[in-house]
Curated annotation (Swiss-Prot):
Family per similarity comment: Belongs to the bacterial ribosomal protein bL32 family.
InterPro entries tied to this protein: Mitoribosomal_protein_bL32 (IPR051991), Ribosomal_zn-bd (IPR011332)
Compartments in which it is found: Mitochondrion
Name used for this protein in its record: Large ribosomal subunit protein bL32m
Alphabetical UniProt keywords: Metal-binding, Mitochondrion, Ribonucleoprotein, Ribosomal protein, Transit peptide, Zinc
One GO-annotated biological process of the protein: mitochondrial translation
Originating species: Drosophila melanogaster
GO CC terms in record: mitochondrial large ribosomal subunit
Top-rank lineage group of the source organism: Eukaryota
A GO molecular-function descriptor: structural constituent of ribosome
Complex and partners: Component of the mitochondrial large ribosomal subunit (mt-LSU).
Binding site for Zn(2+): 95, 98, 108, 111
Length: 195
């Protein structure tokens, strides 16, 4: 309030001075002899955009300064949403099989790549032997030094693909078993099967 009042009074005084003193202010209090003081108003120059803009620095100055809280939020972010400084990860675990580090709840990327390469080799071998025809029978993959454990009658309805390399230690036979069981036709439950 007081600042606005002070500014309005100073503006009023300036306007009065410009009315009564048209030469741009108070007359000189001390004048040296022999020097002539010219009070003529400056000649009006043509308006140019280059003079108005100048080097353009003042045109990009912000009007209001940001508060300390906003500056710190812009610098560091919000802890609950997006925290910009680096933080240590506390959810890293080392794989029990290969020893590489990975995040908790995520498969080990190194082990996953091993399985992916082996699966691609199996798929390419199946594609070489069986072609691109639709598979109407179950496919059995046998590695070097393995024999089919099923009888010949069961093998008639299945296709066999042989890999010319030994089975990797981590790739056990139960990985090729189906994970879903077929529905049983009998609905009777024997007392020995309850527990």
């Amino acid at each position: 309030m007081s600042r606005n009042l002070f500014l309005s009074i100073t503006n009023f005084i300036r306007n009065l001075e410009s009315l009564f003193l048209p030469h741009g202010g108070h007359p000189p209090a001390l004048a040296l002899a022999g020097f002539q003081h010219d009070h003529s108003p400056k000649s009006s120059q043509e308006f140019s955009l280059k003079q108005l803009i100048g080097d353009g620095l003042l045109w990009a100055v912000p009007k209001h300064r940001r508060s300390v809280e906003k500056r710190l939020k812009r610098k560091f972010g919000y802890p609950e949403y997006n925290w910009k400084p680096l933080r240590e990860k506390r959810n890293l675990r080392s794989c029990l099989q290969c020893g590489h580090d990975h995040e908790m709840g995520v498969l080990c990327p190194f082990c996953y790549q091993k399985v992916l390469k082996e699966t691609e080799l199996m798929q390419s071998k199946i594609q070489e032997t069986l072609g691109l025809d639709p598979v109407d029978k179950e496919v059995i993959v046998l590695y070097e030094g393995e024999k089919a454990e099923q009888s010949t009658d069961d093998l008639k309805n299945k296709r066999i693909v042989e890999m010319k390399k030994p089975r990797p230690m981590w790739f056990t036979k139960n990985l090729l078993q189906k994970s879903t069981q077929q529905l049983s036709e009998t609905k009777e439950v024997k007392p020995s099967d309850l527990a």
